[in-house]
């Protein structure tokens, strides 16, 4: 039986720019803060660890190389002690954590998200299906078995998407079909429309993401929608600028874009430009009854006999057997990365405890 009323938080803060350890420490601090505030869920922005490489939108390929090398060196692997520290923080605070991070797997980076449960387990691990525009110079495409978004939890059906995935009608349709009740629309850092230069469309600026795309997601899905955003300081602007290039001096256009929306698309809270921290919301899952009774696109307000979405969640292997009779062992990304293993050997400890109890009974 899910908890229908609880407190949740969205992070709007500056990441530990391209410093893995600093990012992990700051992540744990926010998890602890949300836990102390009695939240059941805390949501972080897209690639919060080690920060969104906004410099890729502004510099040449050659200028980017030293920064890209450092970025790769400070990206996070899911089966690492850094990730286990974050998982322990979730367990210690009995809280769900939606974390966006740059995942390095073998030699490729992915725009990844995990949903960590209050027991420290990884409930869901997903990768952005298609990096946006110049992001393709940094990240790879997520495979078929890592793009599902919605997880069944005791705080409702929780979904996660990265950046422009939140405007993808097919991904929205998929999440609706899964009965999503709470959505994390994780955004990176990018400037407001004050910085718009023709012919660059308004689509490519933060205000439409915050004030159009995100509430539209809430309206169309009828889900509580948390939109965590990264921020920038003057020092952060320097760290996002390669050597030999004059950094920007006004970070204000990058700030104040985080939002939380109700299932009907109405605004719950938005930060001031200079606010850095957690935005809070009191979620009531029963409020979605009021929106779903009007428009449930997974039920009474859809015609699957006319319109259907084809979804393929299989992992496509790099090497396959040419002989259709022969087979090559397959595996899921989740299994290969060790995400189906218990945190800190909890399973072994439980088995040992069970064994000691049996011995005591025999005595």
Curated annotation (Swiss-Prot):
Keywords: Hydrolase, Lyase. The keyword Hydrolase applies. Residues 6-285 form the CN hydrolase domain. InterPro entries: C-N_Hydrolase, C-N_Hydrolase_sf, CN_hydrolase, Nitrilase/CN_hydratase_CS, Nitrilases_CHs. Induction: By cyanide or metal-complexed cyanide complexes K(2)Ni(CN)(4) and K(4)Fe(CN)(6). Pfam families: CN_hydrolase. One of its GO terms (biological process) is cyanide catabolic process. Oligomer of dimers, forming left-handed helical fibers. Catalyzes the hydration of cyanide to formamide. Degradation of cyanide may be important for plant pathogenic fungi in infection of cyanogenic plants. Also able to transform metal cyanides. This is Cyanide hydratase. It comes from Fusarium solani (Filamentous fungus). The gene is chy.
């Amino acid at each position: 039986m899910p908890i229908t009323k609880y407190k949740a938080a969205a992070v709007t803060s500056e990441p530990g720019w391209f410093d893995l350890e600093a990012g992990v420490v700051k992540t744990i601090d926010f998890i602890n803060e949300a836990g102390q505030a009695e939240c059941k869920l805390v949501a972080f922005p897209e690639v919060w660890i080690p920060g969104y490489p906004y410099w890729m939108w502004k510099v040449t390929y050659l200028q980017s190389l030293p920064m890209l090398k450092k970025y790769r060196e400070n990206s996070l692997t899911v089966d690492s002690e850094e990730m286990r520290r974050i998982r322990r923080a979730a367990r210690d605070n009995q809280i769900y954590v939606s974390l966006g991070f740059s995942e390095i797997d073998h030699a490729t980076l992915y725009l990844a998200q995990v949903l960590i449960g209050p027991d420290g387990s990884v409930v869901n691990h997903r990768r952005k299906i298609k990096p946006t525009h110049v992001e393709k110079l940094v990240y790879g495409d997520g495979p078929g078995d890592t793009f599902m978004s919605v997880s069944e939890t005791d705080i409702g059906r929780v979904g996660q998407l990265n950046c422009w995935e939140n405007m993808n009608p097919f991904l929205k349709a998929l999440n609706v079909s899964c009965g999503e009740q709470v959505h994390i629309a994780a955004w990176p850092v990018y400037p407001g429309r004050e910085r718009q230069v023709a012919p660059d469309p308004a689509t490519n600026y933060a205000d439409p993401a915050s004030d159009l795309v995100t509430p539209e997601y809430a309206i169309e899905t009828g889900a509580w929608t948390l939109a965590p955003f990264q921020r920038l300081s003057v020092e952060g602007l320097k760290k996002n600028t390669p050597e030999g290039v004059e950094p920007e001096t006004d970070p204000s256009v990058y700030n104040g874009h985080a939002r939380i929306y109700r299932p009907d698309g109405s605004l719950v809270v938005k930060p001031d430009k200079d606010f850095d921290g957690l935005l809070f919301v009191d979620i009531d899952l029963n409020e979605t009854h009021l929106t779903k009774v009007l428009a449930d696109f997974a039920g009474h307000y859809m015609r699957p006999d006319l319109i259907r979405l084809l979804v393929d969640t299989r992992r496509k292997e790099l090497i396959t057997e040419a002989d259709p009779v022969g087979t090559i062992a397959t595996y899921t990304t989740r299994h290969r990365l060790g995400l189906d293993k218990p945190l800190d050997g909890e399973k072994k400890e439980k088995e040992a405890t069970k064994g000691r109890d049996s011995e005591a009974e025999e005595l």
